[in-house]
Curated annotation (Swiss-Prot):
Keywords: Cytoplasm, Dioxygenase, Iron, Metal-binding, Nucleus, Oxidoreductase, Vitamin C
Reaction(s) the record says it catalyses: [ribosomal protein uS12]-L-proline + 2-oxoglutarate + O2 = [ribosomal protein uS12]-(3S)-3-hydroxy-L-proline + succinate + CO2
Gene Ontology cellular component list: cytoplasm; cytoplasmic stress granule; cytosol; nucleoplasm
Species per Swiss-Prot/TrEMBL record: Homo sapiens
Protein name: Prolyl 3-hydroxylase OGFOD1
């Protein structure tokens, strides 16, 4: 059973070169002159319009649905077969996970070629007439296949030249419980996406198209069916771009210097192994080599148990953090935290921890930590001693800054310097080490995204994980570091209970937390009362 209507044999002919050509048309009811004028008037006036062959709505932005786009079912079945025989490539980054075909612009398969002509000649002409937009002949289309846990998160599709987006669905019988809906977002006063206000369910031969604009935020929700594939052809009609509103910049998250707190707080909270000076030297050597380290069993067991109990059973007030084109997770209201969690937050802001992190990393996060200049003087003194005692030194010269950040520049020459060295040196000399942090709750559907205004700067990331027992990488929720402008992963940090992750990143490195998919619900089999996991997330600046 495939739920499709019985098909009449579609017309076919043999082309000049002996190749089979197939014929098809899009819904002639849509092209009927009276209806066409009504649709054009609704588009012009930005008013809703509903008819059995086409529906236009303005909420939350202009979009249209043609339930039965192609007239020949036989053609659609032939098209589906050709598409399923294409090579698909996995598309995977912070924003999406699905499979995509190569560009269909030059494919010669008969059904694909015919659909291309229908869309970018016949339908484009009709669309130009009703929208009064001078749409170009640019062909921009591909085939996408979404399977279990695949998704495309919130975005606006806006790119130079894109005017109208379209999706033609070729799916088996489908309902809302299977996911894969096209979700449309409302916007707030800053033209940022706010919440999903409409979800369009895929169905066989349904065409959806919408105007690409600064407010056309949408997503493909996660596919929840383990048996069925969500197959579609999508693309854009190009034309003159709309004027964008001024960019909105979120208020910066406040940073604060350390809280005066003596070293006793470390002895109360932290595994004594990590307070041993010799072990700290070992940690620093490893950190300076790779710019990242995972310190397991970081908190004392009794403290960590109390923290987890407070998170799991305590009265923590959570609020959702957005907007969804940048992030979606829950943040704790710090002023209302149970006392044990307040104390843990205080630990990560304490003067003693700033100094401990300096010892772990070699960064100057405390005035007692040695500066690069101090280290250079020590090295010069040591080299002088070597030359005096041995007559010569066979050690290779050390680079001026031995603290390498996580970066896509794995082999930097000694001549590479900061773009603004003098300004940065002044900042370093006059700046006070700062931090910002929050307690986060991660569960199914949560994520963070890299966006146009993601700030890339030198920083030390600290994450302490809680409630991650049984958590698998395939669930998502890991923190991924990538080179700016690239999809290549430089480092992945997987959630691990009572493990402290430290990562030093540079201006060419960005990070995101991968979308947590529905596989994560398997955690409930072992921990029925637990939903996701938690982390204490802090960023430190020299």
């Amino acid at each position: 059973m495939n739920g499709k209507r019985p098909a009449e044999p579609g017309p076919a002919r043999v082309g000049k070169k002996g190749k089979k050509e197939v014929m098809a048309e899009f819904s002639d009811a849509v092209t009927e002159e009276t209806l066409k004028k009504q649709v054009a008037e609704a588009w012009s006036r930005r008013t809703p319009f509903s008819h059995e062959v086409i529906v236009m709505d303005m909420d939350p932005f202009l979009h249209c649905v043609i339930p039965n786009f192609i007239q020949s079912q036989d053609f659609l079945e032939g098209l589906q077969k050709e598409l399923m025989n294409l090579d698909f490539h996995e598309k995977y980054n912070d924003l999406y996970k699905f499979q995509q075909s190569d560009d269909l612009k030059k494919r010669r398969e008969p059904h694909i070629s015919t659909l291309r002509k229908i869309l970018f000649e016949d339908f484009r002409s009709w669309l130009s007439d009703i929208s009064k937009i001078d749409l170009e002949s640019t062909i921009d289309m591909s085939c996408a296949k979404y399977e279990f846990t695949d998704a495309l998160l919130c975005h606006d599709d806006e790119l130079e030249g894109r005017r109208i987006a379209f999706i033609l669905y070729l799916v088996p019988p489908w309902d809302r419980s299977m996911g894969g809906t096209l979700d449309l977002y409302s916007i707030d006063e800053h033209f940022q996406p706010k919440q999903i206000v409409k979800s369009l369910i895929p169905s066989w031969n349904k065409l959806v198209f919408f105007e690409v604009s600064p407010v056309s935020f949408h997503q493909v929700s996660e596919v929840l069916s383990e048996e069925k594939s969500r197959l579609s052809i999508s693309g854009w009609f190009h034309g003159p771009s709309l004027t964008r509103p001024p960019n909105y910049f979120e208020p910066p998250i406040p940073r604060s210097p350390h809280i005066p707190q003596d070293h006793e707080i470390l002895y109360d909270w932290i595994n004594p192994t990590y307070l041993d000076m010799d072990y700290q030297v070992q940690i620093q050597e490893e950190f300076e080599e790779s710019s990242e380290i995972l310190l397991k069993e970081f908190l004392k067991p009794e403290k960590f148990t109390k923290v987890c109990e407070a998170l799991e059973h305590g009265h923590v007030e959570w609020s959702s953090r957005g907007p969804p084109n940048k992030r979606f997770y829950e943040k704790a209201e710090e002023s209302k935290l149970p006392e044990i969690l307040k104390e843990c937050m205080k630990l990560f802001r304490s003067e003693a921890l700033f100094l401990l992190l300096s010892n772990f990393t070699g960064l100057k996060l405390h005035f007692l930590a040695p500066s690069e200049e101090d280290e250079m003087n020590d090295k010069k003194e040591a080299e002088t001693t070597d030359i005096t005692e041995e007559g010569t030194s066979h050690s290779p010269p050390e680079p001026e800054n031995n603290q390498m950040a996580i970066s896509n520049n794995s082999q930097q020459s000694n001549e590479q310097t900061d773009p603004e060295p003098e300004e940065n040196e002044t900042k370093k000399e006059s700046s006070v080490p700062m931090c910002q942090g929050e307690l986060r709750h991660w569960k199914t559907g949560h994520y963070t995204l890299i966006h146009d205004h993601s700030k890339a700067e030198f920083a030390l990331d600290l994450i302490l994980y809680c409630g991650c027992e049984g958590w698998e990488p395939e669930y998502g929720g890991f923190t991924s570091y990538i080179a700016k402008g690239e999809d290549e992963e430089l480092l992945t940090v997987n959630p691990e209970s009572n493990s402290l992750a430290l990562v030093y990143r540079d201006r060419e490195t960005l990070k995101f937390v991968k979308h947590i998919n529905h596989r994560s619900l398997e955690q409930k089999k072992t921990f029925p009362n637990r939903t996701g996991f938690w982390d204490f997330s802090f960023i430190y600046y020299e």
